[in-house]
Amino acid sequence: MEEPAAKRPKLSDRSEPLTQRDVVLFQKEALFRQLNRYRAEARAGQVQVEELRRAHGQVGERLAAVCGVVRSVARAVADARGDGDARALCERVAGGDDDEVVARAAEFAAVVAGGLGRGAAAGEGWHRLEAVNSRLAAENAQLAAELGAVRGFYAELLRRYDRDESETVRRVFKVEESEPPRAATPVEESSAKGAASDGEAATAVVEREMQIEELQTEIRVLEDTVAQLTDWKRLNEQELTKLRQMASSAELSQRHPTPPSSSNLSADLQVLRSKVEKLSHENKELAQLNEAYLGKFQQLSADREIFNNRLSAEFQTAQETLKKHNSNLEKDLVRIRTARDELLSKVAVLEAQKSKSDMLEDLEKMLALQQEQLKALSEHKPEPARDAVMKELQDLEKAFKELSQYSNKKYSEYVNQESLMSKLTVEKTKADQKYFAAMRSKDSILIENKNLSKNLSKSNELIQQLKDIEKSLQAKIENLNKQLHISRINEKRLLDSNKTTSLKIMDLTSQLSKANKSSTLVQQECNKLIEEKAKMESKLNDLEIETKNLATKLTYQENKSKKLHKTLVSNGGDNGALAEELENFRTVVYCSLCSKNWKDTVIKTCGHVFCADCCKERLAARMRKCPTCNKGFSSNDLLVVHL
């Protein structure tokens, strides 16, 4: 169901300032102009894409055919050539796809040229054709650039024409127009009728002039085309004559090839035989060297095993001897320490006993002296004062006894203290002896530890030396293994070269016929490529002619548009039909509620189309009726469409 046609919006008066409605209408017309421009570009792009697809298909077919011929030539050349690199390249070209063939075209051409060794005249003609091709390609690029510039100028001219014819542009930018017509009086009406008839006559004259100019333009285009075709025909005849001469010279060279002389073949055979003999002699020498290296390797392996066994046995013997010597030294040290402690204790006891005996001897001497004095006193004769003396003596005796008891008591205490001191001294002496013995044992242990550390360091040095010797022997063994591997590789290489040489000798006799076949195929391929080049040049010439015709038509259309514009301005013609069509298009495309968004949402209950924003606004405001037919709808009745 189509929307009812909305009324055409009116612009505000020019004397008044711009309104929001004028700006919106200006933006809408700008969008329509841009849309028309994009449509024109899209149509031109579609035409170009179709033409390019057709040309691409033709080029793909021709490329496939050319690649097939090149693969066949590569197979023939691979059968003819005996060297490894060229044969491998030909096999890759023959077995690869089109991309592989194109990527290795230059290398394959060099191989074919080296195998043929002739065709200098054809090569010169090919280079000349390549120069002509490059020149035509440059001219084609230049013409394509000119055509693009002309198209851009024509598009810009159309855009300016659309903008100049737009009322909104004139309203926004305040372009001055001619004075509007006043109310017509009867006299003015009659004069207007006469002017209208005169305008129709002038329009007819302008149309006849435009037709005449169009015919003259077509005549000039046809004359230019005929001249270009004549020049192209003359150039093609010259190129055809040159190609026929080149083909005849190539056929003569193929029919009468210069066969290789027998002397050259015999010389090549002699050289190959000498190479084979030299390689066999080198192979024998390498075999002898290989055997000598194997013997040296086995001898070194046996020597290394013997040396390792002997060294390990000596190391074990020295280690056991050192352990036994250390155990004997420890036993002797314990025995010496025990004897020393016993002797020290005996010496201390003897020293204590000696001091006690000396003291007893002194006391005995004192007692003996006192007894002698007592005896001497008792032996004296009595005197007159005997009683007093006796009494005094008794007192002295009593005092002496008390003194003796006291001295004995003190002596006993002293003896006890002396014995205690002697015991403590003995204990202290024993403790000192034990301390000094411990210190001496510590020193001896430190000395033994130092000796053991020295022995251990010497053992580690010996082990490191043995490891270094083992590494050097391992390196020598690896070098011998590498030399053995190299000698085996050389032997294998010599055998392969021997086989390759024999194969080359067998292939030398068949290369001449295969080379002739490959040259024939290459000549056919060259002829096909020349035909393809001629077709491409003819197509390029057609494009040049078409470009010139388009340029001429463009000039004619520009002149025609200018004249039509002048006629329209002078006659004051109305473009109401075009404006009405544009307004109808706007009504169909834009939403009838806001007149600014595209129609993209349809109401399924009635089929009317609006923009999504207006539909959501009406649902949010609880206005759930169609603005056109007042049918109710909900959010589930909305459907997104693409116009």
Curated annotation (Swiss-Prot):
Residue ranges, annotated region (Disordered): 173-200, 246-267
Reaction it catalyzes: S-ubiquitinyl-[E2 ubiquitin-conjugating enzyme]-L-cysteine + [acceptor protein]-L-lysine = [E2 ubiquitin-conjugating enzyme]-L-cysteine + N(6)-ubiquitinyl-[acceptor protein]-L-lysine
Enzyme class, UniProt record, top EC level: transferase
Pathway annotation from the record: Protein modification; protein ubiquitination
Coiled coil: 200-233, 262-406, 446-494, 520-555
Similarity comment text for this entry: Belongs to the BRE1 family.
Identification of the protein by name: E3 ubiquitin-protein ligase BRE1
